[in-house]
Amino acid sequence: MTQFASPVLHSLLDTDAYKLHMQQAVFHHYYDVQVAAEFRCRGDDLLGIYADAIREQVDAMQHLRLQEDEFQWLSGLPFFKPDYLNWLREFRYNPDQVCVTNDNGKLHIRLTGPWREVIMWEVPLLAVISELVHHYRSPNAGVDQALDALESKLVDFTALTADLDMSRFHLMDFGTRRRFSREVQQAIVKRLQQESWFVGTSNYDLARRLALTPMGTQAHEWFQAHQQISPDLATSQRAALAAWLNEYPDQLGIALTDCITMDAFLRDFGIEFASRYQGLRHDSGDPVAWGEKAIAHYEKLGIDPLTKTLVFSDNLDLQKAVELYRHFASRVQLSFGIGTRLTCDIPQVKPLNIVIKLVECNGKPVAKLSDSPGKTICHDKAFVRALRKAFDLPQVRKAS
């Protein structure tokens, strides 16, 4: 299946903010590190028939480059350094780093190369896959249907929050990677801009064009890579946290907690890290139990939770966000990142549950052992056992 009408992507900045944030840190600290990442479809979709169309889009991505107005805009943000931005100006996607095949109906994608370059593929490539699949499966759906669905949800949201003080409710768009299309994401974000509680988007291109605040810090791959970069597996998570503060000592300070479970994270998140990081992000497991653990940890360390922010971003919709806000709003600062349930929530359209995750660093395995066992990713069972032992994780978690 080939011949999609035109390139899906139009800007190098059509990606999640944390990709550039991590890329700058990799550029400065791990310039020569090599990695491999692989695509996973967590659902039962047979996407192999789209391999040729995806390959065409991958080839087209080599023509994307940072435009002058984009360069100037990034230069005005407080956390990018000139050496990185000048390098990014010359960056081009290398399609040779991407292997796309149809494996008996299943879509197989493997990315290999320098981490500083491979890091850029994940989000736009997932967005390409999502848009291509929905283009062929749901050719009559689009912006109008998405906006109609959103308006209906906003009516329910208004009723649901009528008795609440919403002044501390903050919602962000996290919907790039699994969006129905670029046009749908833009339309949804423009509509949400009318709401006082909408504070920004993870998409740098949309943030620039719509004058929004770009949102994001780091992803699982930052912690995963340190499992092989760090000389000691047991201290690799602390090494990742410290390296991030070295790059961003006073900003972008929301730490992701579930690369090796929340409990293992909190054992590493002592008073110095807890004081310097502005907050934590939830991405798997029971969100209420996670939030209670986070608040208890801050209190145990003598830190007022109201000075910290909890970001919830795991499979959220507006109703779940309100439920969490009701539970936690008086005790801690809160933000909510909603993705698929904003940018691909259209009647009769089945969103894709797709990811691209790091599987190797410098030729050796890395793993993610999240608080949702179904999200665990690693080929090497021996490494998973070593990781569990290093972080004192008693529960056996299936590697998939």
UniProtKB/Swiss-Prot annotation:
Post-translational modification comment from the UniProt entry: Transiently phosphorylated on a His residue during the reaction cycle. Phosphorylation strongly increases the affinity for substrates and increases the rate of nicotinate D-ribonucleotide production. Dephosphorylation regenerates the low-affinity form of the enzyme, leading to product release.
Protein's gene: pncB
EC number annotated for this UniProt entry: 6.3.4.21
Segments crossing the lipid bilayer: none
A GO cellular component annotation in the UniProt record: cytosol
InterPro entries: N/Namide_PRibTrfase, NAPRTase_N, Nic_PRibTrfase, Nic_PRibTrfase-Fam, Nicotinate_pribotase-like_C
Protein name: Nicotinate phosphoribosyltransferase
Example GO biological process: NAD biosynthetic process via the salvage pathway
Job description of the protein: Catalyzes the synthesis of beta-nicotinate D-ribonucleotide from nicotinate and 5-phospho-D-ribose 1-phosphate at the expense of ATP.
Alphabetized HAMAP family for the sequence: NAPRTase
Keyword hit for Metal-binding: no
Similarity-based family: Belongs to the NAPRTase family.
Phosphohistidine found at: 220
Catalyzed chemical reaction(s): nicotinate + 5-phospho-alpha-D-ribose 1-diphosphate + ATP + H2O = nicotinate beta-D-ribonucleotide + ADP + phosphate + diphosphate
Functional pathway: Cofactor biosynthesis; NAD(+) biosynthesis; nicotinate D-ribonucleotide from nicotinate: step 1/1
Pfam families in alphabetical order: NAPRTase, NAPRTase_N
Keywords per UniProt: Ligase, Phosphoprotein, Pyridine nucleotide biosynthesis
Molecular functions (GO terms): nicotinate phosphoribosyltransferase activity
SUPFAM superfamilies associated with the record: Nicotinate/Quinolinate PRTase C-terminal domain-like, Nicotinate/Quinolinate PRTase N-terminal domain-like
